[in-house]
Amino acid sequence: MAPSWRFFVCFLLWGGTELCSPQPVWQDEGQRLRPSKPPTVMVECQEAQLVVIVSKDLFGTGKLIRPADLSLGPAKCEPLVSQDTDAVVRFEVGLHECGSSLQVTDDALVYSTFLRHDPRPAGNLSILRTNRAEVPIECHYPRQGNVSSWAILPTWVPFRTTVFSEEKLVFSLRLMEENWSAEKMTPTFQLGDRAHLQAQVHTGSHVPLRLFVDHCVATLTPDWNTSPSHTIVDFHGCLVDGLTEASSAFKAPRPGPETLQFTVDVFHFANDSRNTIYITCHLKVTPADRVPDQLNKACSFSKSSNRWSPVEGPAVICRCCHKGQCGTPSLSRKLSMPKRQSAPRSRRHVTDEADVTVGPLIFLGKTSDHGVEGSTSSPTSVMVGLGLATVVTLTLATIVLGVPRRRRAAAHLVCPVSASQ
């Protein structure tokens, strides 16, 4: 029997309810056993096009959505024509169509788009029975190896970035439980909570290294060049979010030189109905025996002492955080530059740093702009009748399957979504 994989799918309801449970997928000698509940969204990353199949019972409640309320990508591409009796809605678009974005990394081509459910009142009614929902979609195509058609194997990955460098350095950024003992399985928060973030580099057989968080920014989408944005870490390791009323800070001492932990008081952007946040950080490493300096540091602001203090190293390295003059232009100026694609860094430093993203962080209890008349405050009513998902989060696991060399790359990757787990 071939190995089995398990991944998590969460439906997050705007009213503060979360439906989340492990969804098993097995494979036995090439035969896939379907989960007990049919998936509501299926995605196929093919050689030149993207196929998205959506169940009309999108939220698993028995209330069917209208195909006209579904669209794909920023260009709002419409689905294929379907009959009223059809149980699914189907999209078939080219990888470059519908406003999809392409990101080129060192080892992959990443096409990103989203499925949107945007309900409109039916007829002369002024009420809505469902709310908006948005499903991020990504297709990853490896750049390495033979470029013939059968060599491309698209894969789904969870939107918790892990970056592999050429010298086998693996950078990661993860949400952790409050006691730091394990990774947080559900990215949901109430306003007033504190997010625990852990940046880490796995060095393998590399010489000992010390990890630093150079800068971090929070945005509403995975693209850190978008607006609005909020800077969390800047000036080569100054946790500037702690200057506000927040208590955000780096954790000292470190668990080890290759790990850096910090907390961020959760927030949402005013005047925006979305309740999701993505955090992107630029991570870098130095030799573990090098003394931290102004360009390589981890500094937190203490309101009680009204001063900056480092996780390690002399206190003088944090003085530049006060004026924001720590050697090079700040993050705010970097963000105004065009998005980086493949490489303006020199080959000497390409393995020393990486951009990693964690998200989305979901903030429960934030009122949606799309109200429902006649709603009640009962949690049961919110779950069953009126609090349908405005944001749908897919946590997707990378499944690497060995296929015969003659097989075409149009790998059919199924990502089930279910709200009834």
From Swiss-Prot:
PANTHER family membership: ZONA PELLUCIDA SPERM-BINDING PROTEIN 3
Chief place where the protein resides: membrane
Membrane disposition: Single-pass type I membrane protein
Tissue specificity: Expressed in oocytes.
Species this protein is from: Sus scrofa (Pig)
PROSITE patterns per record: ZP_1, ZP_2
Family, as annotated: Belongs to the ZP domain family. ZPC subfamily.
Domains (record comment): The ZP domain is involved in the polymerization of the ZP proteins to form the zona pellucida.
Endpoints of the signal sequence: 1-22
Topology, Cytoplasmic side: 403-421
Pfam families: Zona_pellucida (PF00100), ZP-N (PF23344)
Transmembrane segments: 382-402
Name of this protein: Zona pellucida sperm-binding protein 3
Subunit composition and interactions: Polymers of ZP2 and ZP3 organized into long filaments cross-linked by ZP1 homodimers. Interacts with ZP1 and ZP2.
Region named Disordered: 331-351
InterPro entries from the UniProt entry: ZP-C (IPR055355), ZP-C_dom (IPR042235), ZP-N (IPR055356), ZP_chr (IPR048290), ZP_dom (IPR001507), ZP_dom_CS (IPR017977)
Disulfide bonds listed in the record: C45-C139, C77-C98, C216-C281, C238-C299
A single MF term (Gene Ontology): structural constituent of egg coat
Subcellular location: Cell membrane
GO cellular component, as recorded: collagen-containing extracellular matrix; egg coat; extracellular matrix; extracellular space; plasma membrane
A Gene Ontology biological process term: negative regulation of binding of sperm to zona pellucida
Cleaved propeptide residues: 333-421
Keywords linked to the UniProt accession: Cell membrane, Cleavage on pair of basic residues, Disulfide bond, Extracellular matrix, Fertilization, Glycoprotein, Membrane, Pyrrolidone carboxylic acid, Receptor, Secreted, Signal, Transmembrane, Transmembrane helix
Residues on Extracellular side: 23-381
Modification Pyrrolidone carboxylic acid occurs at: Q23
